[in-house]
């Protein structure tokens, strides 16, 4: 990635696999013993299938219900990377993935797209993914790799042309902030009512703004949260916990 602090490793090297996966005190096994529930594999496309298979097996030996989720931005059922079709969902690799297609569909819909296109996008994922994968998707609206949801839902196209200093200090004007907040509530409702696990990027629930990395990674706004938005997210969490249908019910889109 051109970042000198990130080491380039050979994932097929035996000593590296022992350190990360196989040894009794490997990274994967040690943290599972200490209470981790599973692992999210950053940029799963960069990891060989054989490496993911060994990691999955080692995690299962340590904790039978360990969850292995991959960062895949596209439809992971037919992903091709480095000219090879990946086998993520053919058993023994990923339990599920980050649901970037849902995120893309939400923003497309709320920024002027059609409900039909949103439904088609979700039906495509449902048809392509195994049921257990679909119901364990990591449903995201914001992540550390994307501009803040609130910013994306209120910014104009021209404002993306601002220089780095302008983007670093940008805040939505009051009129567009109100529109963006309404859209974010709609996005959250969709996120919390779709099959999968709604996953909040810290600060989104508090109304945090910011363009792309590093402006989307500021510290949490302790003492300056949008209390109305925070209460809205808390209520969504309560409803999600109370209504089992939202976790394992069937999904059906209806024309109105």
Predicted regions and their residues:
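Carbohydrate-binding surface patches
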Residues: 253-256
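Short clusters of hydrophobic/aromatic residues that line enzyme substrate/ligand-binding pockets
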Residues: 9, 98, 149, 220-222, ...
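Active-site-proximal helices and loops of the catalytic beta/alpha 8
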Residues: 27, 37, 42-137, 190, ...
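The substrate-binding groove and active-site-proximal loops of carbohydrate-active enzymes
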Residues: 2-21, 36-46, 103-115, 168-179, ...
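Substrate-binding/active-site clefts of carbohydrate-active enzymes
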Residues: 1-34, 55-61, 78-79
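Substrate-binding clefts and catalytic carboxylate motifs of secreted carbohydrate-active enzymes
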Residues: 122-212, 227-228, 242-243
């Amino acid at each position: 990635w051109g970042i000198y602090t990130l080491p380039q490793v050979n994932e097929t090297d035996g000593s590296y696999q022992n350190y990360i996966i196989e040894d009794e005190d490997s990274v994967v096994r040690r943290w599972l013993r200490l209470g981790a529930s599973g692992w999210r594999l950053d940029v799963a496309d960069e990891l060989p299938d054989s490496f993911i298979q060994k990691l999955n097996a080692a995690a299962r030996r340590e904790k039978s219900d360990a969850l292995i989720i991959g960062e895949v931005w596209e439809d992971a059922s037919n992903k091709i990377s480095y000219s090879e079709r990946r086998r993520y969902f053919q058993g023994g690799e990923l339990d599920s993935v980050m649901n970037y297609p849902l995120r893309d569909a939400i923003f497309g819909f709320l920024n002027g797209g059609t409900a039909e296109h949103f439904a088609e996008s979700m039906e495509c994922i449902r048809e392509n993914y195994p049921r257990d994968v679909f119901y364990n998707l990591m449903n995201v609206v914001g992540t550390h790799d994307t501009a803040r949801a609130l910013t994306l839902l209120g910014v104009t196209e021209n404002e993306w042309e601002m220089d780095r200093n302008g983007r670093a200090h940008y805040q939505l004007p009051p009129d567009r902030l109100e529109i963006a907040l309404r859209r974010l509530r709609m996005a959250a409702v969709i996120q919390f009512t779709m099959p999968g696990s709604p996953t909040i990027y810290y600060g989104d629930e508090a109304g945090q703004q910011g363009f792309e990395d590093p402006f989307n990674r500021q510290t949490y706004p302790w003492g300056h949260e949008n209390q109305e938005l925070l209460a809205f997210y808390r209520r969504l969490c309560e409803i999600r916990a109370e209504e089992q249908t939202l976790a394992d019910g069937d999904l059906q889109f209806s024309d109105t």
